[in-house]
């Protein structure tokens, strides 16, 4: 994925030194856009190894509407452990907002079910979107959502999606985010009897943490390999009935892992 490496190079060359919530410090740019044609391969970076189970299980966890790390830990996934309280709770983060957004009149909105209904019944709608940025509950979340809004677009029986990410950890987080939403597009396309189209990614504060810069410089020396292919082995009756075993990624031959420290 040359686009990803080009972004790293851009930040290293033009990034602004900024302070951040974690105290680590970043090199940051404001505003960046990338587009991935999902027909040309599954957009999982090859210039370092990514932990595929973490990507898939996290997405399934979001879709379950869960906000406790119990499911993740049962599947040996620890990517949210640093933000959980002693009971494993994270507050009303992504899963809660996707599946059970609280309204002022006491009702709950399942944004994912609404999206599925709209794609099937009104595919030309300009309102097929999901928001995680619930202003009234941000302070209750252990971590404010980074990828905050995604919108679907149907054209000629192909499903595309654009994501807006307000804050992006390019070295550790972005490869996961791109792959996760690509999987989601494949899942929803399958459920709605559509083909996959494009994934468009737009970032706000797009940054490298300063303790990742030298690691990123090592990564950009690697030449990207052919993208793998995502295969969904069966079609469940519902978007919410997929399991980890339903996904197979073929032809993924990445370079070795480059491990970076996460900033909490």
From Swiss-Prot:
Protein's GO biological process: dTMP biosynthetic process; dTTP biosynthetic process; methylation
CDD domains, A to Z: TS_Pyrimidine_HMase
Quaternary state and interactors: Homodimer.
Name of the coding gene: thyA
Leader peptide range in chain numbering: none
Annotated residues for binding of (6R)-5,10-methylene-5,6,7,8-tetrahydrofolate: 51, 169, 263
Keyword Transcription regulation in record: no
SUPFAM superfamilies membership: Thymidylate synthase/dCMP hydroxymethylase
Family: Belongs to the thymidylate synthase family. Bacterial-type ThyA subfamily.
Positions bound to dUMP: 21, 126-127, 166-169, 177, 207-209
The EC number(s) this enzyme carries: 2.1.1.45
Protein's name according to its UniProt entry: Thymidylate synthase
Catalytic activity: dUMP + (6R)-5,10-methylene-5,6,7,8-tetrahydrofolate = 7,8-dihydrofolate + dTMP
Cellular localization per UniProt: Cytoplasm
PROSITE patterns in the cross-refs: THYMIDYLATE_SYNTHASE
């Amino acid at each position: 994925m040359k686009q990803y490496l080009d972004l790293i190079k851009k930040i290293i060359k033009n990034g602004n030194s900024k302070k951040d919530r974690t105290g680590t410090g970043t090199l940051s740019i404001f505003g960046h856009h990338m587009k991935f044609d999902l027909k040309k391969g599954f957009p999982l970076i090859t210039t370092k190894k990514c932990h595929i189970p973490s990507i898939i299980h996290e997405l399934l966890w979001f879709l379950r509407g869960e906000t406790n790390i119990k499911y993740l830990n049962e599947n040996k996934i620890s990517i949210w452990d640093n933000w959980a309280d002693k009971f494993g709770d994270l507050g009303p983060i992504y899963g809660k907002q996707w599946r059970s957004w609280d309204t002022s009149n006491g009702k709950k909105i399942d944004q994912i079910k609404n999206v599925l209904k709209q794609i099937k019944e009104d595919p030309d709608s300009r309102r097929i979107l999901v928001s995680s940025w619930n202003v009234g509950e941000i302070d209750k979340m252990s971590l404010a959502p980074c990828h905050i809004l995604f919108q679907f677009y149907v054209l000629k029986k192909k499903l595309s999606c654009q994501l807006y990410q307000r804050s992006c950890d390019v070295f550790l987080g972005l490869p996961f985010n791109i792959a996760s939403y690509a999987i989601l597009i494949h899942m929803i396309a399958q459920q709605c009897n559509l083909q996959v189209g494009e994934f468009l990614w737009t970032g706000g504060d797009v940054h490298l943490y300063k303790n990742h810069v030298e690691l990123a410089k090592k990564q950009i020396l690697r030449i990207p390999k052919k993208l793998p292919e995502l295969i969904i082995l069966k079609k469940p009756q519902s978007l919410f009935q997929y399991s980890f075993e339903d996904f197979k990624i073929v032809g993924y031959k990445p370079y070795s892992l480059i491990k970076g420290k996460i900033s909490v």
